[in-house]
Each structure stands twice: as structure tokens, then as C-alpha cells.
Design a protein with these regions (language model features):
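Feature captures the catalytic cores and cofactor-binding loops of soluble hydro-lyases/lyases
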Residues: 2-134
Length: 134
């Protein structure tokens, strides 16, 4: 039975993506080019490749990042935290210290923020794998 004719889950999906070396274009085409998180781009051009891992959803709302700071300690190795924002307008949700903790201490593969970040120059200079809206 081929991979494409049966349901696959979790670690098996990640293994297949790595083994077959799928590109971001192929993944986007498979997702119908929906732009899963529109306007979210890598801040480091060397991070245009696909990052693999389980995701951990986090939330920031009403211009507060309190819940994000509580959840930072729950991130596991190889996870990709995705931080969604609601009513945060032009406020940066996290910066270099929190990103470094998630990536270097907890072992996150990347960090995705559906919102703004601070310390952009440091994030770029340290080549941290961050996708954000600005």
C-alpha cells in the first residue's frame, strides 16, 4: 500500500516529509495555497526552508503576552510554537530573550508569531528561526 493511499499521523508524517525532502512549494500546493498564516514571513532569509515538528498553539490577547510567558516553559524539543494574537494591534508580543529560551533552552525547531516581535536586529544577527508579521 502506498503512502498516499492510507491515513498517516504524527511522527510518520514528519518522517515522510523529511525522507522525501518536500519543498515549501509542494507543501503549499498540497494545502491548496491557503497561506495557513497569511502575511507571516521568516525574518532570516536562510530560514525559507520547511521546518518539521509538532506545533504548540499559544495565545496573546488584549495587548498582553502574559499567557505566552506562562506557556514558554511547556515547549518540548522539536516543537514549533505558534503564537496567535487577538486585539494586540501594534504591540510586539515577544523578543529575543523569549525566542532564545524557546529555541536554545527548550529545543523548539522554529517560532511562528501571528503578530509583531521586538529585537528584530538581534533575531536576525543570531539567525534565530522566527516567522512573524513584522
Amino acid at each position: 500500500m502506498s503512502v498516499m493511499s492510507r491515513k498517516i499521523y504524527g511522527d510518520e508524517i514528519i518522517k515522510i516529509l523529511k525522507d522525501y525532502d518536500f519543498t515549501t512549494t509542494e507543501v503549499a500546493d498540497a494545502l491548496n495555497k491557503t497561506g495557513v498564516i497569511p502575511l507571516c514571513y521568516p525574518i532570516n532569509h536562510n530560514h525559507n526552508q520547511v521546518e518539521y515538528g509538532y506545533t504548540r498553539t499559544m495565545f496573546a490577547s488584549n495587548s498582553s503576552n502574559w499567557e505566552v510567558h506562562e506557556d514558554v516553559f511547556k515547549i518540548n524539543k522539536n516543537e514549533i510554537p505558534i503564537i496567535f494574537t487577538e486585539n494586540c494591534h501594534d504591540r510586539a508580543i515577544i523578543g529575543e530573550l523569549v525566542v532564545r529560551y524557546m529555541v536554545e533552552k527548550n529545543g523548539a525547531n522554529a517560532v511562528v508569531i501571528h503578530g509583531l516581535v521586538r529585537d528584530i536586529k538581534s533575531l536576525i544577527d543570531n539567525k534565530l528561526p522566527v516567522w512573524c508579521m513584522g
